[in-house]
Regions:
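Residues that recognize and position ribonucleotide moieties
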Residues: 30, 49, 71, 96, ...
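Cyclic nucleotide-binding regulatory domains
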Residues: 37-98
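A small-molecule sensor/coupling module
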Residues: 91, 110-147, 151
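Localized chelating/binding microdomains
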Residues: 10-20, 48-51, 61, 102, ...
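Cyclic nucleotide-binding regulatory module and flanking cytosolic helices
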Residues: 1-29, 84
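Phosphate-/nucleic-acid-contacting segments
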Residues: 146-198
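Short, basic/aromatic recognition patches
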Residues: 30-37
Length: 198
């Protein structure tokens, strides 16, 4: 088990050496069922998760309680509401498992203690935060610049295995369309290249 965990951690491009060491030394293995809330909006993030197996989504709820997924995370991804964890402010996001997950978990106190005691930890967490910011800017820009059909096609090309694991109603919300509209997009794409884009 430890060798598999080490391999998974070493594959992480965005998790630095210090965080890898902390996940190995201080992290705990936790198994979580599908559709379980890891972080509720309005709460301070208490845990940093490394996904060993499974899938997690980050979502936001509007005033009426309807949720929209803003990002998906899969094996070897590290996830939390980083801004909440570091600032101590309540998160505006929810973190929910989409599949049963095996997670490696670091608690906030350990991360913050190491943040203060390890000389390179602040710069490494800053680099991680900057990377996440770039990802969010790209997501935002693509959401504005591309149609839902174009975004779906891009996901089909770049992440077909991951795309197949996302429930269609969640994917529809992520793309900003209804499940019926997503069904039409998928049907049109299957029917051939001469089809009209939405």
């Amino acid at each position: 088990m430890r060798l598999d965990l080490t391999r998974a951690i070493l594959r992480l491009m965005h998790v630095n050496t210090v965080l890898r060491d902390y996940f190995l030394e201080f992290g705990e293995d936790v198994n979580v069922d599908a559709n379980k809330l890891l972080l509720r909006a309005g709460e301070v993030a208490k845990y940093l998760y490394l996904i060993q197996s499974g899938a997690v989504r980050l979502c936001v709820r509007n005033a009426e309680g309807a949720e929209t997924t803003v990002q998906f995370f899969f094996e070897d991804d590290m996830v939390c509401s980083l801004e909440s964890m570091l600032s101590g402010c309540p998160s505006g996001l929810e973190l929910i498992t989409m599949e049963a997950c095996q997670l490696r978990v670091l608690d906030r106190d350990t991360v913050l203690t190491k943040f203060q005691s390890h000389a390179t930890m602040p710069s490494e967490l800053l680099a991680l935060t900057q990377q996440r910011l770039v990802e969010y800017i790209n997501l935002y820009t693509i959401a504005i610049a591309q149609t839902p059909t174009q975004r779906y096609q891009a996901m089909l090309v770049s992440q077909p295995d991951k795309l197949a694991r996302i429930p269609l109603h969640i994917l529809a919300g992520y793309l900003g369309v209804t499940p019926v509209h997503l069904s039409r997009i998928r049907r049109r794409l299957k029917s051939g290249p001469g089809s009209q884009a939405f």
